[in-house]
From Swiss-Prot:
<keyword id="KW-0527">Neuropeptide</keyword>
<keyword id="KW-0732">Signal</keyword>
<dbReference type="GO" id="GO:0001664">
    <property type="term" value="F:G protein-coupled receptor binding"/>
</dbReference>
<dbReference type="GO" id="GO:0007218">
    <property type="term" value="P:neuropeptide signaling pathway"/>
</dbReference>
<feature type="signal peptide">
    <location>
        <begin position="1"/>
        <end position="19"/>
    </location>
</feature>
<protein>
    <recommendedName>
        <fullName>Neuropeptide precursor capa-1</fullName>
    </recommendedName>
</protein>
<comment type="function">
    <text>Encodes at least three neuropeptides: two of the periviscerokinin family (APHPSSALLVPYPRV-amide and LYMARV-amide) and one pyrokinin (AFFYTPRI-amide).</text>
</comment>
Length: 86
């Protein structure tokens, strides 16, 4: 009985670790990265990537929930998304 109580306390006292999505880059993690942020972020939407109205319904849930980051330079706002596959 004492063993169950100790095991339960250990399990609930550990910090909650969430599985990070491959697309998930927190801004703090990007800021602390040793390489330039351009290695992690690319402009969104990508240049040359054309949207097809017929294919919009077939997008995967992962791409729909993709995180976007905004950088404001003067009056212009730039959106970035994590780089994948490089």
């Amino acid at each position: 009985m004492l063993l169950w109580i100790v095991a339960t306390l250990l399990i609930f006292s550990l910090p909650v670790s969430t599985a990070l999505d491959y697309n998930d880059f927190s801004l703090q993690r990007i800021a602390r990265a040793p390489h330039p942020s351009s290695a992690l972020l690319v402009p969104y939407p990508r240049v040359g990537k054309r949207s097809n109205i017929l294919n919009n319904n077939s997008e995967s849930q992962n791409s729909v929930q993709k995180r976007l980051y905004m950088a404001r330079v003067g009056k212009r706002a730039f959106f970035y998304t994590p780089r994948i596959g490089k």
